[in-house]
Amino acid sequence: MNQLNALKQFTTIVADTSDIESICKYKPQDATTNPSLILKAVSSSVNKRFIDQAIEYARKKGGSYNYKIVNASDKILVDLGVEILKHIPGYISSEVDARLSFNKEKCILKAKKIIDMYEEKGISRNRVLIKLAATWECIKAAEELKKNNIACNLTLLFSFAQARACAESNVFLISPFVGRIYDWYLSQNLILKNPADQDPGVLSVCKIYDFYKKYNYKTIIMGASFRNVQQILSLSGCDRLTISPVLLKELESSNKELNRKLCPPTSFLNPPVPLTEAEFRWEHNQDEMAVQKLSEGIRNFGKDQLSLEKIFSKLI
């Protein structure tokens, strides 16, 4: 049995791509997208029909020039998601504009709009996860959205404080970024390249997993942003792992033995008192890496969203 199929025995595999061919090949349960992947998809001639559909939709909706651009951007996000859902049995994760990451109310409105657009295409909200950056505002938005049966995927998660706040707000799923944590420690010369069991990104997810399972939190942990197969193998047994096509191929090509690394306990403890907003901000602020990477991630996803809108600005 190859490592990909072995991993599927105790971890749900999610494809970190909007490429339909890769999704069909590796047969993941779910798929995730982000502004960078959407921008990449839009840049491919294969997806020209989605661009045309988005422009037509925006023109029909009318409104100001800027309003049309926003509607076109939302439409292509949803249409690509609908197409991906034809090839997977589970969830598609679609991301809210990162520029809204510090505005709870606007995140809620955008999330509801995206869900409405999916439902207009006949897709149940039970198959869509709304991706939000794991800021305090977005965590609280996700908590409120869940009351409307809208499940969220809290992304750009780098600190233990973020993970704890998500669990305490009962969000559906988190995406701790293994590779980006590793990148930061490597860039600071704080670790050796490929440190195996001492990989700080892997250790971060292990700590979150142990905390969640010890206190029986229901939030799903989906490790993300992998740089190599060893990081993935070190997290075998994690609830979910979202993996790029390149690393899915590498796993499929290997028949080496794979052992489960993460296992849930058989008994639980009563959870601690939830963090207040002030406690969350202080604890997160104590983690230099997390502060830098969250800020950088929001900025970069914001830039990609702006690039997508610039493409539509020339076509509408």
Curated annotation (Swiss-Prot):
Pathway(s) the chain acts in: Carbohydrate degradation; pentose phosphate pathway; D-glyceraldehyde 3-phosphate and beta-D-fructose 6-phosphate from D-ribose 5-phosphate and D-xylulose 5-phosphate (non-oxidative stage): step 2/3
Transmembrane segments: none
Signal peptide start-end: none
Gene3D superfamilies: Aldolase class I (3.20.20.70)
One protein family per Pfam: TAL_FSA
GO molecular function, one term: transaldolase activity
Residues of the active site: 131
Localization: Cytoplasm
Catalytic activity field: D-sedoheptulose 7-phosphate + D-glyceraldehyde 3-phosphate = D-erythrose 4-phosphate + beta-D-fructose 6-phosphate
Keyword terms, alphabetized: Cytoplasm, Pentose shunt, Schiff base, Transferase
E.C. code: 2.2.1.2
Location, primary (coarse class): cytoplasm
Record's GO cellular component terms: cytosol
PROSITE patterns reported in the protein's UniProt record: TRANSALDOLASE_1, TRANSALDOLASE_2
Source organism, top-level taxon: Bacteria
GO biological process: carbohydrate metabolic process; pentose-phosphate shunt
Protein family (similarity comment): Belongs to the transaldolase family. Type 1 subfamily.
PANTHER family on file: TRANSALDOLASE, TRANSALDOLASE A
Assembly behavior: Homodimer.
Function according to Swiss-Prot or TrEMBL: Transaldolase is important for the balance of metabolites in the pentose-phosphate pathway.
Protein name, as recorded: Transaldolase
Naturally occurring in which organism (per UniProt): Buchnera aphidicola subsp. Schizaphis graminum (strain Sg)
Gene: tal
